[in-house]
Amino acid sequence: MKILITNDDGVNSSGIIAARRAVEDLGETIIVAPATQQSGIGHALTLFEPVRVSEVTLRDGSGAYAVSGTHTDAVIIGIFELMDEKPDLVISGINMGENLGKSELTTSGTIGAAMEAAVHGVPSLAVSLQVRRGDIKFHDGHVDVDFSLAAELTGRVASRILRRGLPEGVDFLNLNVPSHPASDEIRITRLGDRMYNVHIKKRLDPRGRPYYWIDGDPAGTDFRVQMSTHLRLKTPPPSPPYHSTAQQALTQWRAGLIRARN
């Protein structure tokens, strides 16, 4: 089995190392990820400048490939250039920060990378871990983040995908892990309508010219309450006639995941 691991937090993220460790016993792994932080740009692809690839050594001493472009570029280059054949699974993550709701479907790079793999017929899994503050992802390596549960679940779900494939009608999975779950039960959910209320912060540069920070605060929303108690495994909504069928197939697939664990 061959597993391609990528992310949008960058090749030096602690989360991508945790992802590799979680699945290294399941098959041959290769990390191909963007050289720099690419969060929030969705399914972006580099079209108007060359994309360069460098071999790098991660902080745990393992090797990886750093791509000068986006996570989407990394998936394409990994599948069609760096690997001899298509991988059996692509894992995107482990992302610092949850990816919930329909808005995240179009803005999340973690989901975008998994989606790109699915476009090319490769089963994929996006994994995101809730963190205390949204800015933690920008201080990776300086703030301790406990990936243990997210890594354990990544390995469990990845093993299920490799053994049984994805459920009928499902192209990829999006797994969200709360920072302090009430249990390790995995629940199937639907995508919510919105994740956060948008806040725009206006500031002035030294020359008096305005600039803006776009921010979101999930505190107090149903997403925050939901993520604080249970693990979430969900899929983007397929076209309406097939939505219930895919949900049923995923629920049955999850039952097999629980039986396999026991």
Swiss-Prot record:
Its main location: cytoplasm. It is an enzyme of class 3 (hydrolase). One of its GO terms (cellular component) is cytoplasm. It comes from the Archaea. It catalyses: a ribonucleoside 5'-phosphate + H2O = a ribonucleoside + phosphate. Its EC number is 3.1.3.5. Keywords: Cytoplasm, Hydrolase, Metal-binding, Nucleotide-binding. This is 5'-nucleotidase SurE.
